[in-house]
């Protein structure tokens, strides 16, 4: 998965990249490791040669300078194409440098409108091109439906497309079609800037988007600590947790992702998949050969595994280690061993 970090100037995008990178970032790009405590526990039990957490990449896309904005805005919007998720950063802290109080709700509305306008322009261009290279009727109807929604100020991610329409529309890389997670950069706890802004203020303008809030500078300080120290210091600073963990969990929720787990002496690993995927689909996340030659899946939930002493034999004897077929719907935290033949 790849995410783009977006937001107006001065909101803290670069600081967020650093906090998410935990020292592993390269400029405005970072790889976020999803700190799943279940993976850590299983790694302690199995003592594998390798432990692999789920991860995703983030890239900051800088907001155009006001002096060059007219010429740069289109390039900025084009740079957002290809992201599977936008981390939309909002400034919710006072800034003497910017010389104005924070207005996160208004900032959210400003960028939302830019995205709506950009998508409308793309649709108009698509219809212009269609005069020379006609679109299929289904394509015309899909674009007309998009145009109708956008003119009503409805982002395309809120439109209930069928599978065929969605496949067609995705080809245009409309910005309002991409899911968003709102990430608010707030005042530190104990700040003398008056009442702290609360993320609940976004409930209405978020329009179904998940939102998290924490002070990015504090999160960056926590990210520089060892994994063992991060939880303790995050709590001491009033943070909901380390930034990478908080953002990753919210991003998974926004995208409808879950993780299943594989274990063994070679590797303990978390595998992200869409909620509702079958065992056979999940096997394909590991390797297409496993999906193609799928026979069965041996499944035990993480909770059942731990309640039976972290012992597979005990799980088998108790009947909580199950044999599932290809149509089994994978649940978050399932520990799965795939049997296959190719």
Where are the regions that the model predicts?
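Conserved G1/Walker A P-loop phosphate-binding module
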Residues: 1-96, 112, 123
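C-terminal-of-GTPase-core extension/linker across diverse P-loop GTPases
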Residues: 1-17, 21-22, 129-332, 336-342
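Conserved Switch II/interswitch segment of TRAFAC-class P-loop GTPases
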Residues: 33-35, 61-70, 81-135, 139, ...
């Amino acid at each position: 998965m790849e995410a783009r970090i977006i937001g107006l100037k001065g909101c803290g995008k670069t600081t967020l990249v650093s906090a998410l990178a935990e020292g592993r970032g390269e400029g405005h790009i970072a790889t976020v490791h999803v700190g799943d405590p279940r993976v850590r526990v299983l790694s302690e039990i199995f003592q594998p040669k390798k432990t692999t957490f789920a991860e995703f990449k983030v890239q900051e896309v800088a907001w155009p300078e006001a002096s060059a904005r007219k010429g740069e805005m289109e390039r900025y919007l084009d740079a957002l194409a290809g992201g599977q998720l936008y981390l939309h950063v909002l400034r919710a802290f006072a800034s003497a440098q910017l010389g104005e109080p924070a207005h996160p709700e208004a900032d959210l509305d400003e960028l939302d409108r830019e995205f709506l306008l950009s998508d409308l322009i793309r649709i108009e261009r698509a219809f212009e091109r269609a005069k020379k290279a006609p679109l299929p009727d289904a394509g015309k109807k899909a674009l007309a439906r998009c145009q109708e929604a956008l003119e009503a100020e409805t982002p395309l991610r809120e439109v209930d497309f069928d599978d065929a329409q969605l496949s067609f529309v995705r080809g245009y890389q409309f910005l309002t079609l991409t899911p968003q997670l709102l990430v608010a950069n707030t005042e530190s706890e104990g700040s003398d800037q008056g009442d702290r802004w609360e993320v609940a203020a976004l409930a209405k303008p978020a329009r179904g988007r998940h939102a998290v809030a924490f002070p990015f500078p504090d999160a960056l300080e926590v990210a520089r600590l060892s994994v063992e120290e991060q939880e303790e210091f995050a709590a001491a600073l009033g943070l909901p947790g380390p930034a990478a963990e908080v953002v990753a969990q919210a991003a998974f929720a926004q995208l409808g992702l879950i993780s299943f787990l594989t274990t063994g002496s070679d590797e303990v690993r978390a595998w992200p998949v869409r909620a509702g995927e079958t065992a056979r689909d999940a096997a394909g996340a590991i390797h297409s050969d496993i999906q193609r030659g799928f026979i069965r899946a041996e499944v035990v939930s993480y909770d059942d595994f731990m309640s039976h002493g972290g012992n597979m034999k005990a799980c088998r004897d108790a009947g909580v280690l199950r044999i599932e077929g290809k149509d089994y719907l994978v649940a978050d935290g399932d520990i799965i061993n795939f049997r296959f033949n190719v």
